[in-house]
């Protein structure tokens, strides 16, 4: 079971770059699918959000081990796709996330910090 995730979020496409945005989006989904088939990641889920007045328009949640996802963040193709996306979509961000068994360790760290600071 995955203990970590990468939350990859994005906002609105740059005006005039919408078609390229879909092209890079398709490249990214194919890349994540390949990573899943190769066992590099456990899986991924894609969400397109309904209009809500905020900046976030969609995200991909990539699931895997903390170690594998740390390696993925510096993988040449991941960096290339993230760079391409940031040139055609506003507000691209990659954020680490605790999932599954990783939640226990994260909450433990938080609880320890609370006890040290109170």
Model-assigned labels for residue ranges:
Residues 1-55, 64-74, 94-118:
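Short S/T/G/P-rich N-terminal loop/turn motif that feeds into the first structured element of a domain
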Residues 80-98:
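Conserved short beta-strand edge segments in small beta-sheet-based binding/regulatory domains
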Residues 63-64, 82:
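Functionally constrained cores in energy, signaling, and assembly domains
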Residues 71-83:
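Amphipathic protein-protein interaction modules
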Residues 57-59:
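Histidine-centered divalent-metal-coordination microenvironment in nucleic-acid enzymes
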């Amino acid at each position: 079971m995955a203990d970590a995730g990468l939350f990859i979020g994005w906002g609105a496409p740059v005006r005039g770059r919408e078609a390229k945005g879909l092209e890079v989006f398709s490249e990214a989904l194919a890349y994540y699918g390949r990573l899943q088939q190769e066992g590099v990641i456990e899986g991924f889920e894609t969400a397109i959000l309904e209009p809500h007045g905020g900046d976030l328009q969609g995200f991909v949640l990539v699931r895997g081990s903390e170690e594998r996802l740390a390696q993925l963040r510096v993988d040449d193709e991941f960096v290339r796709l993230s760079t391409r996306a940031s040139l055609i979509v506003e507000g691209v961000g990659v954020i680490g996330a605790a999932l599954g068994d990783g939640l226990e360790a994260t909450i433990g760290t938080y609880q320890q910090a609370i006890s040290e600071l109170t």
